[in-house]
Amino acid sequence: RQMCIRDSFYTAEELAEIEVPHPSKTVMKHMGTPSVSEAAALLSANNSRLLVPKKKGENYTVAAALDIRTVRQGHIEIVGAGPGDPDLVSVRGRQMLERADLILDAGSLVPKELTLCAKAGATVLSSASMDLEEQFEVMKKFYDKGKFIVRLHTGDPCIYGAIQEQMNYFDQHGMSYHITPGISSFQAAAAALKSQFTIPEKVQSIILTRGEGRTPMPEREKLHLMARSQSTMCIFLSASIAEQVQEELLQEYPETTPVAVCYHLTWKDEQIFRGELKDLARIVKENNLTLTTMIVVGEAIGNREGLSRLYAHEFKHLYRK
């Protein structure tokens, strides 16, 4: 097998600037630099790491250094799986899954079909039975071996995705990571309801929030305060406290405000229940809805009134004058 070896030449001045573990006064006297072999090896390896210190032969001195730029580094990709349908993961997200040496997913919250694209030999694990430290332990083990890791979260990982503590750990340990966003369940709800969640001149804001359950809410973000704007409200993780949610929202929204309770959005067993705000708790209770349920409130649900000015004949913009 032929090897391609690149020759590099350095001046004594360049070599003298490199700190080496075994400087020589004799070499300094004759060559004008305290080291030739070790200094040259380190210079060629971008001053990374000395792998083999200088060895003396009868007519030569040799040393070897490792350029860490050529060593495979570990990496963690936090990927948003989307709301459920495997086809809704992004192109980049699927590419990351196909590349991964380890896929750590969120168990039953992520469809198994999504990990079928894993390459041969990849490890696929569920984090459902792991606490945070156990998750860190398995990811660090693969990372330290230079492996590519996908941490697969439901929806978009940056929305109620519990990635804050993970990023904190990665930052503290100097670990490389990146986030691939995913489609959130509130976007899937808009599509399933065939509704634009903003209405020209009526509703121009979308509130993403949750009811106050085991996780306390900041006082300024109580549901009844958020409801004062009567914006389109998408309420995560709150089906189990639907009665409390209804009570708070009725302080500001009319009782006839449209609501939609969306279960398992984009999954094969998806169910959508529509009604009015005064019926919210009853809808949830009668259909035994708890987990993976999104509650949407607002007059934008099913609305067909109000026209955007964007495509009006007299509306001028950069591409139409």
Which residues does each PLM region occupy?
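Metal-ion/cofactor- or nucleotide/acyl-coenzyme-handling active-site neighborhoods
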Residues: 7, 63-66, 71-72, 127, ...
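Acidic/glycine-enriched edge-of-secondary-structure segments
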Residues: 121-131, 202-210, 233-234
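C-terminal edge-of-domain segments
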Residues: 38-69, 293-299
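Class I S-adenosyl-L-methionine
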Residues: 2, 6-42, 69-86, 91-183, ...
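Class I SAM-dependent methyltransferase SAM-binding "motif I" and its flanking Rossmann-like core
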Residues: 85, 156-229, 271-274
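Short, solvent-exposed amphipathic alpha-helical segments in soluble enzyme
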Residues: 66-69, 91-96, 118-121, 166-169, ...
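Short glycine-rich anion-binding loops that position phosphate/pyrophosphate groups of nucleotides
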Residues: 55-59, 67-68, 83-86, 109, ...
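A contiguous loop/helix-start segment that scaffolds small-molecule binding in enzyme catalytic cores
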Residues: 12-15, 20-31, 54, 60-61, ...
